Swiss-Prot record:
This is Chromophore lyase CpcS/CpeS 2. GO terms for cellular component: organellar chromatophore; plastid. It comes from Paulinella chromatophora. Keywords: Lyase, Organellar chromatophore, Plastid. It is an enzyme of class 4 (lyase). InterPro entries: Calycin (IPR012674), CpcS/CpeS (IPR018536). It is found in: Plastid, Organellar chromatophore.
Length: 198
């Protein structure tokens, strides 16, 4: 089962909310899998939001081409983390379609995931209404596929090639907004001590 989603911005709007993501990352060099988990918060931004306008300016793109975007914050951990190692951050995403249907185009970010420098990637919706993201960094290339099996379950696969060669699979489950207090990321003790590394 999958959802019918007309365009990429609709996909991002459907992704708004808070999510618990359970991940298995396969390190191809070591031939080992590493479990992990994260809490992700996504909020929609209008095309006129000052933060989106700043991202467009950062990438030297016409802000009038923006259809909207989102603010994303994440906090997580992986099983092999060293003491003091952190997987926390936030980013602004801006969408600029390059076709009249809004199903492909540019995804502007004020910071990346694999590398923290500002980055512009490409998005595309496939024939199954899944969202494909391709991002080229200085030292690696990331390809991701996101799709919904229902309004509250999102799946993700990702492959990173370069200095770090990994393949990952994530199951992301929606949580209610009331689980997020004062827009800060809070986790309960059960989640923090789960086998996924919290």
């Amino acid at each position: 089962m999958s959802l019918s989603i007309p365009d990429a911005f609709s996909f991002f709007k459907l992704s708004c909310g808070s999510w618990v993501s359970q991940r298995s990352s396969h390190h191809l060099l070591h031939r080992r899998a590493e479990p992990g988990a994260s809490l992700i918060v996504v909020k929609e931004l209008s095309a006129t939001d000052d933060r989106l306008l700043s991202v467009a300016k950062l990438h030297q793109k016409n802000p009038n081409m923006l259809v909207g975007g989102c603010w994303v914050r994440w906090s997580g951990s992986m099983a092999w983390d060293q003491e003091g190692e952190s997987h926390e951050g936030e980013s602004i995403f801006g969408l600029i379609p390059t076709d009249e249907n809004g199903r492909e185009g540019l995804l502007l970010r004020d910071r990346g995931y694999a590398e923290t420098a500002p980055v512009a990637g490409k998005f595309q919706m496939d024939e199954h209404d899944a969202l494909l993201l391709s991002t080229s960094y200085d030292t690696m290339i990331s390809n991701e596929r996101f799709w919904f099996t229902g309004p509250d379950i999102r799946l993700r696969t990702s492959v990173v090639e370069g200095l770090s060669n990994t393949a990952s699979f994530c199951i992301e489950t929606r949580r209610e907004y009331k689980a997020i207090l004062n827009d800060n990321l809070n986790t309960n003790n059960d989640l923090m001590h789960s086998k996924f590394g919290w």
